[in-house]
């Protein structure tokens, strides 16, 4: 499994925190100092903490666990979706609907509605409706897809959350905490690390930094899944001799 080096992090700007006046004192242990009134994150802590998180994600992947990638702010939205799709996992990248985890029974009903609409749009049902009815259903389907498209095939609660910006996604983190679902999160100098099981102290705004976290996390999950496939093949005697 690939690890992330300090050089990778420096190039992506992971070490740049927020302005000092916006800091959260709970992040003090992870701050190296300040430059031009901007906090500098101590990468000597971030590097091992992130690599430990990646090792744990690989472990979850090897057990066929489900990882939900969460990042709803504009800078993270597209990268979150890509990371989830690339690792065959799940995502929320538009808006976190309250109760997405803690009220999953209701969410499941909405997912069923979305899937019903998808079938109807393909099997000719929409064509039999009046233009107005068809338009209304199409709009409903698009709205549901935007909110739930990334979790429609999750089939139950995830085994872990990977979050970009602990502050912005505090509701998702709280719901995961209530259900005992482990949380991996990028926590900037203005955020509260409470409730995060695997803290990744780092810049949560720079697109290059966000892509670094997400690509590495997706690769870790994939490598874990591949290990599992290799182990099964070996057990069944399918491994080719070199």
From Swiss-Prot:
This entry carries the following GO cellular component terms, namely: cytosolic small ribosomal subunit
Annotated keywords:
Ribonucleoprotein, Ribosomal protein
Query: Does the UniProt entry include the keyword Ligase?
Result: no
Q: Which residues cross the membrane?
A: none
Query: What CDD domains does this protein map onto?
Result: RPS2
Give GO MF terms, alphabetically: structural constituent of ribosome
One Pfam family linked to the record: Ribosomal_S2
| Coiled-coil portions | none
Per its UniProt record, what InterPro entries does this chain match? Ribosomal_uS2 (IPR001865), Ribosomal_uS2_bac/mit/plastid (IPR005706), Ribosomal_uS2_CS (IPR018130), Ribosomal_uS2_flav_dom_sf (IPR023591)
GO BP, sorted A to Z: translation
Q: Which domain of life is it from?
A: Bacteria
- Supply the SUPFAM superfamilies for this chain: Ribosomal protein S2 (SSF52313)
- Similarity-based family: Belongs to the universal ribosomal protein uS2 family.
Give the matching HAMAP family.
Answer: Ribosomal_uS2_B (MF_00291_B)
The name this protein goes by in its record: Small ribosomal subunit protein uS2
Please tell me the species this chain comes from: Aliivibrio fischeri (strain ATCC 700601 / ES114)
């Amino acid at each position: 499994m690939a690890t992330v080096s300090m050089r990778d992090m420096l190039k992506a700007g992971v070490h740049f925190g927020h302005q000092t006046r916006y800091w959260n004192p709970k992040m003090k242990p992870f701050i190296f100092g300040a430059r031009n009134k901007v906090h500098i994150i101590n990468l000597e802590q971030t590097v091992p903490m992130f690599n430990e998180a990646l090792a744990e994600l690989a472990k979850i992947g090897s057990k066929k666990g489900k990882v939900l990638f969460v990042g709803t702010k504009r800078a993270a939205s597209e990268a979150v979706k890509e990371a989830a799709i690339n690792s065959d996992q799940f995502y929320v990248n538009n808006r976190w609907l309250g109760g997405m985890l803690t009220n999953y029974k209701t969410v499941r009903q909405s997912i069923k509605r979305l899937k019903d609409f998808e079938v109807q749009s393909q099997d000719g049902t929409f064509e039999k409706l009046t233009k107005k009815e068809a338009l209304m259903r199409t709009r409903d389907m698009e709205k549901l897809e935007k909110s739930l498209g990334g979790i429609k095939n999750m089939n139950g609660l995830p085994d872990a959350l990977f979050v970009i910006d602990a502050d912005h996604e505090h509701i998702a983190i709280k719901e995961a905490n209530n259900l005992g679902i482990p949380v991996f999160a990028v926590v900037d100098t203005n955020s509260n690390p409470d409730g995060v099981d695997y803290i990744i102290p780092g810049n949560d705004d720079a697109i290059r930094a966000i892509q670094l976290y997400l690509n590495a996390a997706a690769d870790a999950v994939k490598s874990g899944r591949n290990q599992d496939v290799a182990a099964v093949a070996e057990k069944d005697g399918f491994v080719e001799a070199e």
